[in-house]
Swiss-Prot record:
Membrane-topology annotation of the record: Multi-pass membrane protein
Species annotation: Bradyrhizobium sp. (strain ORS 278)
Keywords: Cell inner membrane, Cell membrane, Membrane, Symport, Transmembrane, Transmembrane helix, Transport
Protein known as: C4-dicarboxylate transport protein 2
Major subcellular site: membrane
InterPro entries linked: C4_dicarb_transport, Na-dicarboxylate_symporter, Na-dicarboxylate_symporter_CS, Na:dicarbo_symporter_sf
NCBIfam families: PRK01663.1
Annotated Pfam families: SDF
Family indicated by similarity: Belongs to the dicarboxylate/amino acid:cation symporter (DAACS) (TC 2.A.23) family.
Purpose of the protein: Responsible for the transport of dicarboxylates such as succinate, fumarate, and malate from the periplasm across the membrane.
S-adenosyl-L-methionine found in the keyword field: no
Length: 445
């Protein structure tokens, strides 16, 4: 029997055989989403009840409850287990290089598609600026200097309580280096942190049993509140964004996967549970802990996963990048504001900065859009009201693209570091190891 290192998995013989289809999590979530769509469509008054909405909101809060401790424990543990401090810096630099290159491709793809399919022309929109005033106000915090300063927490306890990913990540990195510097004296504390991570993953396993309920509530409320009629003439933008995000995953991420030696489609199938949870909640953050655990099972290096994935939730949001450039062009077309080539280059540069302040929570993409428009051309800001009503329908695909991109990023950086178990990856993706036959294990001694 092969034991995993630290927080990992081991293969054990199946005692009961295959699970019945109705007990598989992704099947339950998918059924819940479909039921939510039907209830929201046929019974909108019931679906918009506060208690229905609370089902989705409550599930997201349960997940967010454990994100900060998971990030802290995994990052600290990952760094503390590394003997060479320079390796942490090397992994971080490689991750940032990857993030910038892939993010640029995502932004460029949005610009190219937006120019090739100018569906905003002829809309003759007269937006209500008041509808987006709150988002514009929040966008003020996305200025470059403020963004850098906001990474530094006023209080570690406050950062953990708020679940601020970047602030927790900064403290975890510093704490991990300090623990590594202690050498033998720090091993006992390191083991305690490892055990704490196992306990938190146990909490996640309990919370995930409520995933179908949360997905049902979130989807029913969304359809009940907005309904198919809410799409109106903006259905073209939604469809165009879906297609563009799909092209990015298949072409850009697909080529990266093929370069490493696996199929993007098999990878998507491998993380289907996490994708369906994200689809139901429209928040890529809701699947962060499970994604990290699954990437380790896939053969990715634990330290790499612990550093790349949490960082990617602020620095590698591919779906948000596509959305920002595509939506900016759509708004300018709808308002009759022609953007020159130099202005579009400005959009690209500004979006590369403002997107770094986004996090994997619902609505973050809309806030970063406000920040981008405010810098590029303030006259475009009122046009955000045009896409305000349909933002919810695009946030799901943003989140799906974000989580897929971060998963591929962790695999790529692990490969770049020479710490990707290719044999295990192929066996997992080819389903030669059944996920139902795998249990989490703790290495002792």
């Amino acid at each position: 029997m092969a034991a995993a290192t630290d927080i990992g998995t081991r293969d054990v013989p199946s005692q009961t055989g295959k699970k019945p289809w109705y007990s598989i999590l992704y099947v339950q979530v998918l059924i819940a989403i479909l039921i939510g769509i039907v209830v929201g469509w046929l019974f909108p008054n019931l679906a918009t009840n506060d208690w229905i909405k609370a089902l989705g909101d409550g599930f997201i809060k349960l997940i967010k409850m454990v994100i900060a401790p998971i990030i802290f424990c995994t990052v600290v543990s990952g760094i503390a287990h590394i003997q060479n401090a320079s390796k942490v810096g090397r992994v971080g630099v490689k991750a940032l290089v990857y993030f910038e290159i892939v993010s640029t491709f995502a932004l460029l793809l949005g610009l190219i598609v937006g120019n090739l399919a100018p569906i905003g022309h002829g809309l003759a929109a007269k937006p209500d600026a008041a509808a987006v005033a709150n988002y514009v106000k929040q966008a003020e915090a996305q200025k470059s200097v403020d963004f850098v300063l906001n990474i530094i927490p006023d209080s570690v306890v406050g950062a953990l309580a708020r679940g601020d990913i970047l602030q927790v990540l900064l403290f975890a990195i510093l704490f991990g280096f300090a623990l590594m510097a202690l050498g033998e004296r720090g091993h006992r504390l390191r083991d305690i942190i490892d055990d704490t991570a196992h306990a938190v993953f146990g909490v996640i396993a309990i919370v995930m049993k409520a995933a179908p309920v949360g997905a049902f509530g979130a989807m029913a409320f969304t359809i009940g509140k907005y309904g198919p009629a809410a799409l109106g003439n903006l259905i073209g933008l939604i469809a165009l964004f879906y297609i563009t995000a799909g092209l990015f995953v298949v072409i850009v991420l697909g080529l990266i996967a093929r370069f490493i030696g696996f199929s993007i489609f098999k990878f998507v199938a491998y993380i289907k549970d996490e994708l369906l949870i994200v689809l139901g909640t429209s928040s890529s953050e809701s699947a962060l802990p499970q994604l990290m655990e699954k990437l380790e099972r896939l053969g990715c290096s634990k330290p790499v996963v612990g550093l790349v994935v949490p960082t990617g939730y602020s620095f590698n949001l591919d779906g948000t990048n596509i959305y920002m450039t595509l939506a900016t062009l759509f708004i300018s077309q709808a308002l009759g504001v022609d953007l020159s080539f130099s202005q579009q280059v400005t959009i690209l540069i500004v979006a590369m900065l403002t997107s770094k302040g986004a996090s994997g929570v619902t609505g973050a993409g809309f806030i970063t859009l406000a920040a981008t428009l405010s810098v590029v051309n303030p006259a475009l800001v009122p046009g955000m009201a045009i896409v305000f009503s349909i933002d919810k329908f695009m946030s799901e695909v943003r989140a799906l693209t974000n989580i897929t991109g971060n998963g591929i990023a962790a695999v790529f950086v692990s490969w770049w570091e020479g710490e990707l178990d290719h044999d295990l990856l192929q066996r997992r993706l080819n389903q030669q190891i059944d996920p139902s036959d795998v249990e989490t294990a703790v290495t002792t001694g």
